[in-house]
Amino acid sequence: MKTLRLLAFTAALGLAVFTSRSAGQTGFQMLYVFTSNSSGAETVGVVPGPNGVLYGMTAGFYEGFGSVFELQPSGGKWTETVLYTFTGQNGDGANSWSQAIPIVASNGNIYGTTTGGGAYGGGAVFELQPPASGSGGPWTESVIYSFPSAGYGNFSNVIMGPNGILYGYTSGAGAYGQGMVFALAPPSQGGAGTWTERELYSFTGGIDGAYPAGLTAGPGGVLYGVAEDGGDFGEGAVFQLKPVNGAPAGAPWMETVLYSFLGGEAGANPFGPPVIGSGGVLYGTTVNSVFQLTPPGSSGGSWTGSMIYSFWNEDNGGPQSPIIVRNGAIYGLSSLLGGICYGTGGSAFELQKPAGPAGGLWTKTVLHQFYTNSEPYGSFVMDRNGALLGTTLGGPGGTYDGFLFKVDPSSAETEASNENPIPDGICGGDRFPLNRRRH
């Protein structure tokens, strides 16, 4: 069952043209360089844990099957500990993807997904349990769900909702082969047993969307997400999912399309989880823009979509990570992904809302320009001091290892950088398998 809503568009092409003030040089630090022989190649972002600890995953691909790692700050340095290395055998997971960022539950358990492996080769959802306090033992990994086949196209992470339920999506499979959103319920009363998977909604590939590419848990048990394709114009859509009142347990959820993208400079192919801001406003990214959706007022009506900033034809490429919305500003990463011969490795950017009346133009500041071998990608976080922490796909000297970086929007940076330029002869072909278009 689904409800499809006609859309209110305020994003005419004229709104896609924005001013941009001069790039400000800000404090940049390379905090830690990964080595593929210890943690696996290609880091795909970090998430915060307790006491300043960061957790993340490596994709593997060129170097093994990937891993889950911990980064611990101490005395101005960061120490990496590999918590678990995937084997790709005997039902274990193998390799992660662009959005497969783990989540850290309140009990310290880590949950995440892999693209391959599992009991049927279609990927898996895993749980990592920390050792008993003070024991110093290893983390314990369990595969809590295996996707039935490789056709499921599991490229998502999972998010946690009420009662420990995990939600996620696949870009394939479902009743129509266009992707689906699923729920994983833990064993009853937290004891031993089997997690239960349930399909909440299957996309048809029509105006309801196709190939989900981001999911966020909202208040009241509602889910918000984006679909890369489909919608009224075939360029992607933002959707809402919620249980149907009075429906029996296990019934499909109701989908409502909140916004359909027009394509081109007006935005196309959304990617990444929407961010819920003040007043229920949704913020998100497409391959070439940052957008916002404003919910209807108390009198009802449609959601109103507008483009905040267009990256159309910019040298640094489009947004490549979930954005952060803090104190009226938006922070994100841009990258060309594999475009290492284009003379840019992407950027960390800041978008500031207009100071004047509503309807003014947002301004963009490039906080840091990355060299061509870096390719910032995946989730990143803001620490308690307002600095941004993230990872890159590539590392110094053109390696696939990546590094952890810090960008401080409030401090000045000299023109010199401690990144190393890419060596000659590495251009050509798609350097990274982590392409955001996956179908």
Language model segments and positions:
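Extracellular beta-propeller repeat domains
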Residues: 2-439
